[in-house]
Swiss-Prot record:
InterPro entries: His_leader. This is his operon leader peptide. One of its GO terms (biological process) is L-histidine biosynthetic process. Belongs to the HisL family. The gene is hisL. The keyword Cell cycle does not apply. Keywords: Amino-acid biosynthesis, Histidine biosynthesis, Leader peptide. This protein is involved in the attenuation mechanism for the control of the expression of the his operon structural genes. The keyword Hydrolase does not apply.
Length: 15
């Protein structure tokens, strides 16, 4: 799994 792929699939945003 590439870093770009991971970032694209998982978006981490603060609550």
């Amino acid at each position: 799994m590439n870093r770009v792929q991971f970032n694209h699939h998982h978006h981490h945003h603060p609550d």
